Amino acid sequence: MSNQMTIYDISKKAGVSIATVSRVLNGSSNVKPKTRKKVMDIIDQYGYKPNAFARGLGLNSMKTIGILCADSSDLYLAKAVYFIERNLRENEYNSVLCCTGYEVEDKKESLKLLLSQHVDSVVMVGSNFILNDAEENQYIKDAAESIPIMLLNADYDAPNVYCTLCDDFKATQDATEALIKSGIDDILYLYNSRSYSGQKKLAGYQSAYLANDKLVNKDYQQCFEGSHEDIEGVTAFVQKLWDDGLRFKAIVTSEDFLAVGATKFAKANKLSIPKDLQIIGYNDSVLTLCSEPSLTSVNNRLEDMCIQLVKTLIGTLSGTEMPQKTIFSGELIKRGSTDI
Protein backbone atom coordinates (compact mmCIF):
# COMPACT_ATOMS: atom_id res chain seq x y z
CA MET A 1 0.00 0.00 0.00
CA SER A 2 2.80 2.44 0.95
CA ASN A 3 4.32 2.37 -2.52
CA GLN A 4 1.04 3.48 -4.04
CA MET A 5 0.29 6.35 -1.67
CA THR A 6 0.69 9.90 -2.97
CA ILE A 7 0.49 13.30 -1.35
CA TYR A 8 -2.96 13.58 -2.92
CA ASP A 9 -4.09 10.41 -1.12
CA ILE A 10 -2.79 11.74 2.20
CA SER A 11 -4.54 15.10 1.74
CA LYS A 12 -7.79 13.37 0.82
CA LYS A 13 -7.76 11.06 3.84
CA ALA A 14 -6.82 13.91 6.18
CA GLY A 15 -9.38 16.27 4.69
CA VAL A 16 -6.80 19.00 4.08
CA SER A 17 -5.13 20.58 1.05
CA ILE A 18 -2.00 19.24 -0.64
CA ALA A 19 -0.23 22.45 0.42
CA THR A 20 -1.06 21.72 4.07
CA VAL A 21 0.40 18.21 3.82
CA SER A 22 3.54 19.70 2.26
CA ARG A 23 3.85 22.18 5.14
CA VAL A 24 3.57 19.33 7.64
CA LEU A 25 6.30 17.39 5.82
CA ASN A 26 8.53 20.47 5.81
CA GLY A 27 8.04 21.01 9.54
CA SER A 28 6.42 24.40 8.99
CA SER A 29 5.10 26.11 12.14
CA ASN A 30 2.18 27.48 10.14
CA VAL A 31 0.02 24.38 10.82
CA LYS A 32 -2.38 23.84 13.70
CA PRO A 33 -1.21 21.08 16.11
CA LYS A 34 -4.48 19.17 15.65
CA THR A 35 -4.11 19.24 11.86
CA ARG A 36 -0.45 18.26 12.05
CA LYS A 37 -1.29 15.25 14.23
CA LYS A 38 -4.07 14.12 11.88
CA VAL A 39 -1.75 14.27 8.86
CA MET A 40 1.15 12.57 10.65
CA ASP A 41 -1.11 9.79 11.93
CA ILE A 42 -2.21 8.99 8.37
CA ILE A 43 1.39 9.16 7.10
CA ASP A 44 2.49 6.73 9.82
CA GLN A 45 -0.50 4.45 9.26
CA TYR A 46 0.27 3.97 5.57
CA GLY A 47 4.05 4.22 5.75
CA TYR A 48 4.02 7.07 3.25
CA LYS A 49 7.42 8.08 1.86
CA PRO A 50 7.30 11.65 0.47
CA ASN A 51 9.04 12.56 -2.78
CA ALA A 52 10.65 15.92 -3.61
CA PHE A 53 7.37 17.50 -4.67
CA ALA A 54 5.63 16.45 -1.47
CA ARG A 55 8.32 18.16 0.59
CA GLY A 56 8.23 21.26 -1.56
CA LEU A 57 11.51 22.82 -2.57
CA GLY A 58 13.71 20.27 -0.83
CA LEU A 59 17.25 19.16 -1.43
CA ASN A 60 16.08 16.37 -3.73
CA SER A 61 14.27 18.73 -6.09
CA MET A 62 15.49 18.44 -9.67
CA LYS A 63 14.82 22.18 -10.19
CA THR A 64 13.54 21.13 -13.61
CA ILE A 65 10.13 21.69 -15.18
CA GLY A 66 8.78 19.75 -18.15
CA ILE A 67 6.99 21.69 -20.88
CA LEU A 68 4.63 20.01 -23.34
CA CYS A 69 3.75 21.88 -26.53
CA ALA A 70 1.83 20.39 -29.45
CA ASP A 71 3.45 22.48 -32.18
CA SER A 72 6.39 24.83 -31.66
CA SER A 73 5.97 26.26 -35.17
CA ASP A 74 2.69 27.85 -34.07
CA LEU A 75 3.34 31.54 -33.28
CA TYR A 76 1.08 31.60 -30.22
CA LEU A 77 2.45 28.39 -28.69
CA ALA A 78 6.06 29.31 -29.46
CA LYS A 79 5.67 32.68 -27.74
CA ALA A 80 4.02 31.01 -24.75
CA VAL A 81 6.95 28.59 -24.40
CA TYR A 82 9.35 31.54 -24.58
CA PHE A 83 7.56 33.45 -21.79
CA ILE A 84 7.29 30.37 -19.57
CA GLU A 85 10.91 29.28 -20.05
CA ARG A 86 12.15 32.83 -19.40
CA ASN A 87 10.19 33.12 -16.16
CA LEU A 88 11.31 29.69 -15.01
CA ARG A 89 14.93 30.65 -15.63
CA GLU A 90 14.46 33.85 -13.63
CA ASN A 91 13.32 31.62 -10.76
CA GLU A 92 16.39 29.37 -11.17
CA TYR A 93 14.53 26.49 -12.79
CA ASN A 94 15.61 24.61 -15.88
CA SER A 95 13.09 23.36 -18.41
CA VAL A 96 12.78 20.39 -20.75
CA LEU A 97 10.61 20.90 -23.84
CA CYS A 98 8.73 18.12 -25.64
CA CYS A 99 6.89 18.90 -28.88
CA THR A 100 4.14 16.30 -28.86
CA GLY A 101 2.11 16.82 -32.02
CA TYR A 102 -1.67 16.65 -31.76
CA GLU A 103 -2.24 12.91 -31.34
CA VAL A 104 -3.35 11.86 -27.84
CA GLU A 105 -1.05 8.83 -27.69
CA ASP A 106 1.96 10.99 -28.54
CA LYS A 107 1.01 13.42 -25.76
CA LYS A 108 0.76 10.53 -23.30
CA GLU A 109 4.17 9.20 -24.29
CA SER A 110 5.77 12.63 -23.94
CA LEU A 111 4.26 13.08 -20.48
CA LYS A 112 5.48 9.62 -19.49
CA LEU A 113 8.98 10.55 -20.68
CA LEU A 114 9.01 13.72 -18.57
CA LEU A 115 7.78 11.85 -15.50
CA SER A 116 10.59 9.33 -15.95
CA GLN A 117 13.04 12.25 -15.84
CA HIS A 118 11.71 13.14 -12.36
CA VAL A 119 10.75 16.70 -13.26
CA ASP A 120 9.20 18.75 -10.45
CA SER A 121 6.15 19.73 -12.50
CA VAL A 122 4.81 19.67 -16.05
CA VAL A 123 3.36 22.63 -17.95
CA MET A 124 0.94 21.85 -20.78
CA VAL A 125 0.85 24.73 -23.24
CA GLY A 126 -2.44 25.31 -25.04
CA SER A 127 -6.02 24.11 -24.79
CA ASN A 128 -5.50 21.23 -27.24
CA PHE A 129 -4.37 19.02 -24.33
CA ILE A 130 -7.91 18.92 -22.89
CA LEU A 131 -10.43 16.88 -24.89
CA ASN A 132 -14.20 16.45 -24.64
CA ASP A 133 -13.86 12.75 -23.82
CA ALA A 134 -13.11 12.48 -20.07
CA GLU A 135 -11.27 9.18 -20.57
CA GLU A 136 -8.81 10.88 -22.91
CA ASN A 137 -7.87 13.28 -20.09
CA GLN A 138 -7.35 10.56 -17.46
CA TYR A 139 -3.59 10.43 -18.07
CA ILE A 140 -3.35 14.06 -16.91
CA LYS A 141 -5.28 13.30 -13.73
CA ASP A 142 -3.06 10.27 -13.10
CA ALA A 143 0.13 12.31 -13.52
CA ALA A 144 -1.19 14.94 -11.12
CA GLU A 145 -1.19 12.36 -8.33
CA SER A 146 2.61 12.59 -8.22
CA ILE A 147 3.46 16.12 -9.40
CA PRO A 148 1.51 19.35 -10.00
CA ILE A 149 0.28 19.82 -13.56
CA MET A 150 -0.03 23.35 -14.95
CA LEU A 151 -2.38 24.08 -17.86
CA LEU A 152 -2.04 27.21 -19.96
CA ASN A 153 -5.32 28.46 -21.47
CA ALA A 154 -7.18 25.27 -20.67
CA ASP A 155 -9.62 24.28 -17.95
CA TYR A 156 -9.61 20.88 -16.27
CA ASP A 157 -11.05 20.28 -12.82
CA ALA A 158 -8.87 17.71 -11.05
CA PRO A 159 -6.78 17.59 -7.86
CA ASN A 160 -3.30 19.08 -8.21
CA VAL A 161 -4.09 20.53 -11.66
CA TYR A 162 -3.71 24.31 -11.93
CA CYS A 163 -5.25 26.29 -14.78
CA THR A 164 -4.30 29.75 -16.03
CA LEU A 165 -6.51 30.91 -18.87
CA CYS A 166 -8.11 33.76 -20.77
CA ASP A 167 -11.88 34.15 -20.89
CA ASP A 168 -12.00 33.46 -24.64
CA PHE A 169 -15.80 33.21 -24.54
CA LYS A 170 -16.24 36.76 -23.21
CA ALA A 171 -13.48 38.23 -25.39
CA THR A 172 -15.02 36.85 -28.59
CA GLN A 173 -18.52 37.78 -27.46
CA ASP A 174 -17.44 41.38 -26.80
CA ALA A 175 -15.65 41.67 -30.15
CA THR A 176 -18.66 40.34 -32.05
CA GLU A 177 -21.10 42.44 -30.05
CA ALA A 178 -19.12 45.60 -30.83
CA LEU A 179 -19.71 44.95 -34.53
CA ILE A 180 -23.41 44.16 -34.01
CA LYS A 181 -23.96 47.35 -32.03
CA SER A 182 -22.31 49.34 -34.83
CA GLY A 183 -25.09 48.14 -37.13
CA ILE A 184 -23.52 45.08 -38.76
CA ASP A 185 -25.62 41.90 -38.77
CA ASP A 186 -23.88 39.68 -41.32
CA ILE A 187 -20.69 38.68 -39.50
CA LEU A 188 -18.69 35.68 -40.67
CA TYR A 189 -17.00 33.77 -37.86
CA LEU A 190 -13.88 32.04 -39.15
CA TYR A 191 -12.13 29.52 -36.90
CA ASN A 192 -9.61 26.71 -37.23
CA SER A 193 -9.78 24.64 -34.03
CA ARG A 194 -12.33 22.67 -32.05
CA SER A 195 -10.15 22.64 -28.94
CA TYR A 196 -11.40 23.82 -25.54
CA SER A 197 -10.41 27.39 -26.40
CA GLY A 198 -11.83 27.07 -29.92
CA GLN A 199 -15.20 25.96 -28.59
CA LYS A 200 -15.30 28.84 -26.09
CA LYS A 201 -14.62 31.37 -28.83
CA LEU A 202 -17.32 29.91 -31.07
CA ALA A 203 -19.81 29.96 -28.20
CA GLY A 204 -18.89 33.59 -27.53
CA TYR A 205 -19.69 34.54 -31.13
CA GLN A 206 -23.03 32.76 -30.92
CA SER A 207 -23.84 34.35 -27.57
CA ALA A 208 -23.32 37.86 -28.98
CA TYR A 209 -26.13 37.25 -31.47
CA LEU A 210 -28.45 35.73 -28.89
CA ALA A 211 -27.79 38.57 -26.44
CA ASN A 212 -28.96 41.02 -29.11
CA ASP A 213 -32.06 38.99 -30.01
CA LYS A 214 -30.69 37.93 -33.37
CA LEU A 215 -30.74 34.54 -35.03
CA VAL A 216 -27.51 32.54 -35.22
CA ASN A 217 -26.95 31.37 -38.80
CA LYS A 218 -24.73 28.28 -39.13
CA ASP A 219 -23.74 29.34 -42.65
CA TYR A 220 -21.78 32.18 -41.05
CA GLN A 221 -19.76 29.83 -38.83
CA GLN A 222 -17.00 28.35 -40.95
CA CYS A 223 -14.05 26.18 -39.93
CA PHE A 224 -10.84 26.33 -41.97
CA GLU A 225 -9.22 22.90 -41.65
CA GLY A 226 -5.83 23.83 -43.07
CA SER A 227 -2.49 24.63 -41.47
CA HIS A 228 -1.84 27.82 -39.50
CA GLU A 229 0.90 28.53 -42.06
CA ASP A 230 -1.45 28.30 -45.05
CA ILE A 231 -2.60 31.92 -45.32
CA GLU A 232 -3.19 31.54 -49.06
CA GLY A 233 -5.45 28.61 -48.23
CA VAL A 234 -7.47 30.85 -45.91
CA THR A 235 -7.84 33.41 -48.68
CA ALA A 236 -9.08 30.73 -51.09
CA PHE A 237 -11.46 29.36 -48.43
CA VAL A 238 -13.10 32.76 -47.86
CA GLN A 239 -13.18 33.38 -51.61
CA LYS A 240 -15.15 30.18 -52.15
CA LEU A 241 -17.69 31.20 -49.51
CA TRP A 242 -18.09 34.52 -51.33
CA ASP A 243 -18.34 32.87 -54.74
CA ASP A 244 -21.01 30.53 -53.36
CA GLY A 245 -23.14 33.55 -52.50
CA LEU A 246 -22.39 34.14 -48.81
CA ARG A 247 -22.26 37.88 -48.11
CA PHE A 248 -20.79 39.47 -45.01
CA LYS A 249 -19.84 42.93 -43.80
CA ALA A 250 -17.41 41.77 -41.13
CA ILE A 251 -15.23 38.79 -40.25
CA VAL A 252 -14.35 37.76 -36.70
CA THR A 253 -11.59 35.16 -36.51
CA SER A 254 -10.21 32.83 -33.85
CA GLU A 255 -6.57 33.43 -34.87
CA ASP A 256 -4.63 36.30 -36.43
CA PHE A 257 -3.45 34.25 -39.41
CA LEU A 258 -7.09 33.79 -40.43
CA ALA A 259 -7.58 37.55 -40.28
CA VAL A 260 -4.53 38.05 -42.53
CA GLY A 261 -6.01 35.60 -45.05
CA ALA A 262 -9.33 37.48 -44.88
CA THR A 263 -7.51 40.75 -45.58
CA LYS A 264 -5.93 39.28 -48.71
CA PHE A 265 -9.39 38.13 -49.82
CA ALA A 266 -10.75 41.67 -49.40
CA LYS A 267 -7.95 43.18 -51.46
CA ALA A 268 -8.40 40.60 -54.22
CA ASN A 269 -12.07 41.57 -54.46
CA LYS A 270 -11.45 45.32 -54.17
CA LEU A 271 -13.33 45.50 -50.88
CA SER A 272 -12.20 48.50 -48.86
CA ILE A 273 -11.19 47.80 -45.26
CA PRO A 274 -12.90 48.85 -43.02
CA LYS A 275 -15.50 50.63 -45.19
CA ASP A 276 -16.75 47.52 -47.03
CA LEU A 277 -15.42 44.82 -44.72
CA GLN A 278 -14.29 44.95 -41.09
CA ILE A 279 -11.92 42.28 -39.77
CA ILE A 280 -10.98 41.21 -36.23
CA GLY A 281 -8.18 38.80 -35.37
CA TYR A 282 -7.29 37.00 -32.16
CA ASN A 283 -4.05 36.79 -30.09
CA ASP A 284 -2.72 40.26 -31.06
CA SER A 285 0.39 38.68 -32.57
CA VAL A 286 3.03 40.33 -34.74
CA LEU A 287 0.89 39.37 -37.76
CA THR A 288 -1.50 42.20 -36.91
CA LEU A 289 1.22 44.70 -37.86
CA CYS A 290 2.24 42.84 -41.03
CA SER A 291 -1.05 43.56 -42.73
CA GLU A 292 -2.36 46.71 -44.43
CA PRO A 293 -4.31 48.13 -42.79
CA SER A 294 -3.06 46.86 -39.42
CA LEU A 295 -5.47 44.43 -37.79
CA THR A 296 -7.78 44.92 -34.86
CA SER A 297 -7.24 41.90 -32.62
CA VAL A 298 -8.04 40.46 -29.19
CA ASN A 299 -5.08 40.53 -26.83
CA ASN A 300 -5.54 37.45 -24.65
CA ARG A 301 -2.86 38.57 -22.17
CA LEU A 302 -0.48 35.74 -23.02
CA GLU A 303 2.56 37.16 -21.23
CA ASP A 304 0.50 37.93 -18.10
CA MET A 305 -0.89 34.39 -18.15
CA CYS A 306 2.57 32.86 -18.42
CA ILE A 307 3.91 34.98 -15.55
CA GLN A 308 0.96 33.95 -13.38
CA LEU A 309 1.34 30.29 -14.33
CA VAL A 310 4.98 30.25 -13.19
CA LYS A 311 4.05 32.13 -10.02
CA THR A 312 1.41 29.49 -9.27
CA LEU A 313 3.88 26.70 -10.05
CA ILE A 314 6.62 28.07 -7.78
CA GLY A 315 4.13 28.70 -4.98
CA THR A 316 2.72 25.19 -5.24
CA LEU A 317 6.15 23.57 -5.14
CA SER A 318 7.07 25.61 -2.07
CA GLY A 319 3.97 24.38 -0.23
CA THR A 320 1.97 27.60 -0.52
CA GLU A 321 -1.74 27.21 -1.18
CA MET A 322 -2.36 28.64 -4.66
CA PRO A 323 -5.59 29.16 -6.65
CA GLN A 324 -6.35 26.23 -8.93
CA LYS A 325 -7.85 28.50 -11.56
CA THR A 326 -6.82 32.01 -12.62
CA ILE A 327 -8.82 33.70 -15.38
CA PHE A 328 -7.71 36.77 -17.36
CA SER A 329 -9.94 39.07 -19.41
CA GLY A 330 -9.05 39.66 -23.06
CA GLU A 331 -8.74 43.15 -24.49
CA LEU A 332 -9.81 44.30 -27.96
CA ILE A 333 -6.92 46.26 -29.50
CA LYS A 334 -8.46 48.49 -32.16
CA ARG A 335 -6.50 49.23 -35.32
CA GLY A 336 -7.20 50.06 -38.94
CA SER A 337 -9.23 46.99 -39.92
CA THR A 338 -12.32 48.10 -37.98
CA ASP A 339 -14.37 51.23 -37.46
CA ILE A 340 -16.04 50.49 -34.12
Protein language model features and the residues they cover:
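Flexible loop/turn connectors
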Residues: 238-340
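Alpha-helical recognition/docking segments in bacterial nutrient-uptake
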Residues: 1-2, 60-177
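N-terminal helix-turn-helix DNA-binding module of bacterial transcription factors
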Residues: 1-62, 339
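Short beta-strand segments enriched in small/hydrophobic residues
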Residues: 13, 18-23, 57-73, 123, ...
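Short acidic capping loops at alpha-helix termini that bridge into adjacent secondary structure
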Residues: 185-186, 216-220, 273-278
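Short helix-capping segments at alpha-helix termini
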Residues: 90-91, 209-217, 243-246, 268-273
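Hinge/beta->alpha junction and helix N-cap segments in small-molecule ligand-binding domains
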Residues: 70-79, 97-106, 128, 154, ...
